[in-house]
Amino acid sequence: MAKPLTDQEKRRQISIRGIVGVENVAELKKSFNRHLHFTLVKDRNVATTRDYYFALAHTVRDHLVGRWIRTQQHYYDKCPKRVYYLSLEFYMGRTLQNTMINLGLQNACDEAIYQLGLDIEELEEIEEDAGLGNGGLGRLAACFLDSMATLGLAAYGYGIRYEYGIFNQKIRDGWQVEEADDWLRYGNPWEKSRPEFMLPVHFYGKVEHTNTGTKWIDTQVVLALPYDTPVPGYMNNTVNTMRLWSARAPNDFNLRDFNVGDYIQAVLDRNLAENISRVLYPNDNFFEGKELRLKQEYFVVAATLQDIIRRFKASKFGSTRGAGTVFDAFPDQVAIQLNDTHPALAIPELMRIFVDIEKLPWSKAWELTQKTFAYTNHTVLPEALERWPVDLVEKLLPRHLEIIYEINQKHLDRIVALFPKDVDRLRRMSLIEEEGSKRINMAHLCIVGSHAVNGVAKIHSDIVKTKVFKDFSELEPDKFQNKTNGITPRRWLLLCNPGLAELIAEKIGEDYVKDLSQLTKLHSFLGDDVFLRELAKVKQENKLKFSQFLETEYKVKINPSSMFDVQVKRIHEYKRQLLNCLHVITMYNRIKKDPKKLFVPRTVIIGGKAAPGYHMAKMIIKLITSVADVVNNDPMVGSKLKVIFLENYRVSLAEKVIPATDLSEQISTAGTEASGTGNMKFMLNGALTIGTMDGANVEMAEEAGEENLFIFGMRIDDVAALDKKGYEAKEYYEALPELKLVIDQIDNGFFSPKQPDLFKDIINMLFYHDRFKVFADYEAYVKCQDKVSQLYMNPKAWNTMVLKNIAASGKFSSDRTIKEYAQNIWNVEPSDLKISLSNESNKVNGN
């Protein structure tokens, strides 16, 4: 028997997702039955919940394929300029519900599954997250794909089909333990392998220079097998493609020097070639110069460029003159966006193809290459910038090293001509760093090889121009742009918060889903008490639902009427989960000191993964879980304060916690977070932000008014001034009694009685080498948190501020971001055209 419906679920029945036709439901039930029997070969006596999920996924997929084929035919017929988004990460999460929403099928599927006596939410929970990313960079790529399809751009996402995505995080005895994420174990109903487009990728070997040109010979070959996943736009019949490459050994791998005794070993060694796409490197904002990682970076680039050139040659623009293709139109037909420096090898690879294979003169090849590429910078942290050792590149990609040297020589010649005696500038701007062992600076390669370089929030783009790449922006100021990040409102509002999406639609109509700037219309409801109460009711329902989820999944009971104070993101020193933790201990101490004093109840929720080799991040998790143990088991504290470490934070968990959040923690040291996108998701879902003036927080404050965020702490100039003066942590420790108490407790084993010196590394870091100045912002942070508690006691004032934030969040749609890329970088036009589903064109398409 199905569960009774909540108010929110009842309201969903009169919904912007359209009225369900009876024939639709009957069709879906038929299709579901057909797939259960003929695709899964099961009947209801032996079918499991997972079988029912797969039957539903195949049913929904049936509605995608016609649109997918028609979209590709449409592109083949019309030959629009193509956009290629190259990324080593696509953090997609789950696909089923997003597809139903974008195709307008959710209500019909809901009804069909209900009539079959099943629970659609239970089926949705079966789907594995496609965790092919670490955090913000990979999730941004996923949001961008959704927006590009919704805007009708002829766009493709290209990446790697990792067999194992970001590890699953288990917390054992308070420590993070990593487990492999075998996300493909049960199969993936959304992908289609395309063995007919399999391509060779070369490694190692040597370079041969002859009169007729340059050849890269004696290489090892690995095959790249593409898997295509459909990317549906919202209600526009456009379905674009994400193509992910999987590594396969060629059939003669290690068997060319056939030797009877080695046959079995040669077959077993095929694994070595296929390891390239085995696992995602779990580093966020940290460069690890491993050979396998460099192989991954070249693998995706080499396969993708062959594919792009094949598609270009198949189009009417790929005309031939004599023996070769004319590539003059290439940059008018192809835009390639490099998502960070990970796919930077695309620049020398395209040069290799143009010069060595297509026999173009260097100057022509370079002109085409520069016009084709654009580069997005995502971080200013020095430890995150990619610098590959020259000897490794020479071993793995000898021809590419020669090309990089040639690019660098011509680049430096230009600098010498412009700044004749400035030797230091040459050193600073070279693609090759000579200090110590020689390294290639991949960011410099990207800047020199692209026609546009962008940061991802105004403040970040300013830092990029004035500090990190100052010399380059002085040389070519017009090359540098800002494109503030955004999030897709389909996943981050309609899907994760249907109650709020409905409430908004009732007031301002449904068009905001494709034009989020329309949320400004909500300003006219600021004085509407009934609407504010409805807004609060939606939040309360989300909090209840999340509380029930925590109880079921994590066996923790929380107070659903407490303030939900949430910080969920990768664990990193610069994101300052430690500052949050110090505040938690401060609140605990205040309750203990004066238990009768009024205290606004809080549930502090912290979640995120630490890179497996990042000792300090793992210690921070252990500190949080140790503090939680003490706080949650202290009877004097009761339900006033609870601390939850949210295990295995991922996209599907974000969709649950974000709509339930009251207070969003965005507390990185000013000048360290490039943009952040979690901050935007919380804002759109009716949480208030406590944050520093960093990343996109600055623009959020600009849009909503600084008085409608809880802004605290040092600004960029203050941080610079403190650096100049010299940061002395001890001064703050001695001046602030509450801080001193907290640090002493951590230091003397109050939270680790069995091992009093457990946290000595954290204490040592905080006092002697804290690059992110936690103590410097502690006092301002705690005072700001007191203001948060004050406001929370006044629901009307709180909800008014919430509404102001939601009404101001329209700028942060990834649709707006993508329109800006389209206009200012890619030179393509978004299209409102709803692709016709009739099959008037049956031409073979170029996929």
Swiss-Prot record:
Regulation of protein activity: Allosterically regulated through the non-covalent binding of metabolites, being activated by AMP and inhibited by ATP, ADP, and glucose-6-phosphate. The activity is also controlled by post-translational modifications including phosphorylation and acetylation.
Cellular-component GO terms for this entry: cytoplasm; cytosol; extracellular exosome; extracellular region; ficolin-1-rich granule lumen; secretory granule lumen
Keyword Zinc-finger appears in the UniProt entry: no
Positions of the record's site feature: May be involved in allosteric control: Y156
Residues recorded with modification Phosphoserine: S15, S524, S561, S639
Modification N6-acetyllysine, positions: K470, K796
Recorded catalytic activity of this chain's protein: [(1->4)-alpha-D-glucosyl](n) + phosphate = [(1->4)-alpha-D-glucosyl](n-1) + alpha-D-glucose 1-phosphate
Essential cofactor(s): pyridoxal 5'-phosphate
N6-succinyllysine, modified sites: K364
Modification after translation (UniProt): Acetylation, which is up-regulated by glucose and insulin and down-regulated by glucagon, inhibits the glycogen phosphorylase activity by promoting PPP1R3B-mediated recruitment of phosphatase PP1 and Ser-15 dephosphorylation.
Gene Ontology biological process terms from the UniProt entry: glucose homeostasis; glycogen catabolic process; glycogen metabolic process; necroptotic process; response to bacterium
Stored PROSITE patterns: PHOSPHORYLASE
Residues the record lists as N-acetylalanine modifications: A2
UniProt site (Involved in the association of subunits): C109, C143
UniProt keywords, alphabetically: Acetylation, Allosteric enzyme, Carbohydrate metabolism, Cytoplasm, Disease variant, Glycogen metabolism, Glycogen storage disease, Glycosyltransferase, Nucleotide-binding, Phosphoprotein, Pyridoxal phosphate, Transferase
Effect of K470Q: Decreased glycogen phosphorylase activity
NCBIfam families per the UniProt record, alphabetical: P_ylase
Assembly and interaction partners: Homodimer; enzymatically active. Interacts with PPP1R3B; recruits the phosphatase PP1 which dephosphorylates and inactivates PYGL/glycogen phosphorylase.
Function: Allosteric enzyme that catalyzes the rate-limiting step in glycogen catabolism, the phosphorolytic cleavage of glycogen to produce glucose-1-phosphate, and plays a central role in maintaining cellular and organismal glucose homeostasis.
Disorder association: Glycogen storage disease 6: A metabolic disorder characterized by mild to moderate hypoglycemia, mild ketosis, growth retardation, and prominent hepatomegaly. Heart and skeletal muscle are not affected.
Family statement: Belongs to the glycogen phosphorylase family.
Protein's UniProt name: Glycogen phosphorylase, liver form
Source organism per UniProt: Homo sapiens
